């Protein structure tokens, strides 16, 4: 007996479910919230991973468009106005967030065609 114990492998370093799935959003936290939220009696192992991926995709999409809106306005910081412009100018995001009011977002610039001044034809000589 050499006294080395059971010669098993060293315990592997813990790896989060988010990193296993290649996500930034917290899979463990979403799983906990799904369990505590009384949405269902049981929550499968894949559900929080899928939900985290969907939320991460939506956040990335909104931030991408808002960043473009900020750059168009020659600003380096995204403000609520940029989020509003990004969401309302995108057809699918606008449909998804149609019932959402963004504080300090303002409105989209829009002038009805009938209110615009009429173009007069100059007589050709």
Swiss-Prot record:
Gene3D superfamilies: Histone, subunit A. Core component of nucleosome. Nucleosomes wrap and compact DNA into chromatin, limiting DNA accessibility to the cellular machineries which require DNA as a template. Histones thereby play a central role in transcription regulation, DNA repair, DNA replication and chromosomal stability. DNA accessibility is regulated via a complex set of post-translational modifications of histones, also called histone code, and nucleosome remodeling. Its main location: nucleus. This is Histone H2A. Keywords: Acetylation, Chromosome, DNA-binding, Methylation, Nucleosome core, Nucleus. Residues 1-21 are annotated as: Disordered. PANTHER family: HISTONE H2A. GO terms for molecular function: DNA binding; protein heterodimerization activity; structural constituent of chromatin. Belongs to the histone H2A family. The modification N5-methylglutamine is found at residue 104. The nucleosome is a histone octamer containing two molecules each of H2A, H2B, H3 and H4 assembled in one H3-H4 heterotetramer and two H2A-H2B heterodimers. The octamer wraps approximately 147 bp of DNA. InterPro entries: Histone-fold, Histone_H2A, Histone_H2A/H2B/H3, Histone_H2A_C, Histone_H2A_CS. GO terms for cellular component: nucleosome; nucleus. It comes from the Eukaryota. The modification N-acetylserine is found at residue 2. It is found in: Nucleus; Chromosome. Residues 1-18 have a biased composition (Basic residues).
